Amino acid sequence: MIMLSLVMVFSPVFDRLSGYHYVHPALMAGRGSVLQAAIQEQTVVGLPLRLRIPAIHVDAVVERVGIASDGAMDVPKGPLEVGWFDLGPRPGEKGNAVIDGHFGTIKGIPAVFNNLYTLRAGDKIYIEHGQGTITTFVVRELKRFGPTDDAVDVFVSSDGKAHLNLITCEGEWNKITKLYSERLVVFADVE
């Protein structure tokens, strides 16, 4: 399931949407290799198919995203889909599952996470899995980061619990860098 070149295994990954670097938890924990981490992990939930957030009227198809050719975490293809980082845990497994989505208006269509900033602690997030099960997460907090802020806790968790972190852009659009000035992360915990 996890296939990376040696360069990618030993290098942090920069997420162009969120502006974060990702280092696989196996490397952070000193276990030596991504392969060992994959063997040690037992998949207990199916692949995520849909993300539902009733508080902001989101009902989106979940695409699998990995690492793009430029070394960045990939983003969903369209403005209405979300991307699950498939090199990390599945939503509902131990660790931080990460899902990104677009912000703003793209070709006149409000993007899936355009209103993510309106979520509040206690709001529910639902992930529908391939085998028909649903995992419920509860929003813990929202944090804003600058593009260069350290945000390792977005991808890595050491508490042995299942978390879901949603990432989108926010702030002012820079026409030169083609980046937004801030990143919004919604931290949620399995119910």
What label would you give each PLM region?
Residues 68, 75-82:
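Solvent-exposed edge beta-strands and adjacent loop segments
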